[in-house]
């Protein structure tokens, strides 16, 4: 099972591997065992529940690390899961050259959708902004709420 998983992962486009994509290769216990072995061998890095990223040895320490930064992996994960997203407010302001402060947190705006999925690599954690965490005066107004 492990060899079949490894071949499938190597042939996939993108850096993110979802557990549900590998379900056809064996029973849940076999998949769990094979994924655990691949993580311990440094072929994959676990970034969330059922979400793995392709790994490569680090240039300095040789410790396995994801081949892409957390922001890129999170964006690909959201796309694969069908979650609509955009960059967080701080990243948008920086990209639009409205500020010179470099955002150091990985933040995604999910609009009206509440997400509790935890994605992390090491100590870096993806944080979420949505209409529930945004102050009332900064919330997006829906089109139906506009006066006629």
Positions of PLM-derived features:
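Short beta-edge/loop segments at beta->alpha junctions of small alpha/beta modules
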Residues: 1-72
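Nucleic-acid-binding surface
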Residues: 8, 56-148
